[in-house]
Amino acid sequence: MSQPITRENFDEWMIPVYAPAPFIPVRGEGSRLWDQQGKEYIDFAGGIAVNALGHAHPELREALNEQASKFWHTGNGYTNESVLRLAKKLIDATFADRVFFCNSGAEANEAALKLARKFAHDRYGSHKSGIVAFKNAFHGRTLFTVSAGGQPAYSQDFAPLPPDIRHAAYNDINSASALIDDSTCAVIVEPIQGEGGVVPASNAFLQGLRELCDRHNALLIFDEVQTGVGRTGELYAYMHYGVTPDLLTTAKALGGGFPVGALLATEECASVMTVGTHGTTYGGNPLASAVAGKVLELINTPEMLNGVKQRHDWFVERLNIINHRYGLFNEVRGLGLLIGCVLNADYAGQAKQISQEAAKAGVMVLIAGGNVVRFAPALNVSEEEVTTGLDRFAVACEHFVSRGSS
């Protein structure tokens, strides 16, 4: 008989880079999860914008099981049918001509930054190596991507960091313009800063970045790891803005919970990457590709994408009612089903405490820094699940406010 597993085992056995909740989920269906004790939770965290179709979706399970019954892995000395079908779906649905597959958003961003450096090196020379990123950004945890992310708390302990990376103020085209010049090889930006507080870019800002990149022969990289695959109500957020990048990174929702990432590129950009210039053992794995292909098939429909916009309205309307009652938030912002509630000055820095109260009440939410409660639910979350989950969130807000005033 196997040893019973408890939450305390995490503290005993795991390298402590996470501080997980005190309960352990063991089963999920749709937008509901149950823990070891049988307690039910409505899941508005979505595995941090990953579980785009909820838990244990029957068609994703079928796609995974079908491929699992054939073969699991060969390595990149061989290709496979699943990954080629997935590549064609992404190319047909976006600006891209070529795709590189990997396992995560960080790997996709690493590949994008490496491609940008090589593109500039081959076309213009080694002097053109500068990367412009943005304060409060998040692009992953590799040394290169954590350096591009504009949050020193994630990078300062790992110096010396890769050089020639500078950070402008987000949504400030003048700040970006002061840093972008002929030595810049790339600008990397999130259309919505997710970890940085659910802050949407303005159209003028992204259009201005496109123009600056064109003027200085720099590549424009959109990090759509969190915003991609229907999260905003378009397949990718760049489609909202009418601004097309040279490179786009995608992961999270692309696999619906199965690890997969991708770099999308134009033909011109992709041409500098030749055999041996980059790679990954598991990228394009047939299991991941089979699941991701089904995810795209289910999400890239007018019904699903329009449904995301409708669900956005459900959330915002109910969250504003809750806020009118308890007065916690200055603003409810975001696009589609990436929504942030910004705490007012009286409750600054207490987003984590609210998320903990929410879990006690039976609803899972995220934070984006100390001041923003973040929602990233499944794109197919039902109206009943939204209502039930936000009723529980209202209870959590009531408990939080009453605890603070007691």
UniProtKB/Swiss-Prot annotation:
Q: What is its EC number?
A: 2.6.1.81
Which reaction(s) does its UniProt entry say it catalyses?
A: N(2)-succinyl-L-ornithine + 2-oxoglutarate = N-succinyl-L-glutamate 5-semialdehyde + L-glutamate
The pathway where this protein functions is: Amino-acid degradation; L-arginine degradation via AST pathway; L-glutamate and succinate from L-arginine: step 3/5
GO terms classed as biological process: alpha-amino acid biosynthetic process; arginine catabolic process to glutamate; arginine catabolic process to succinate; ornithine catabolic process
Needs which cofactor? pyridoxal 5'-phosphate
Family (UniProt): Belongs to the class-III pyridoxal-phosphate-dependent aminotransferase family. AstC subfamily.
Its recorded name reads: Succinylornithine transaminase
The source organism is Escherichia coli O157:H7
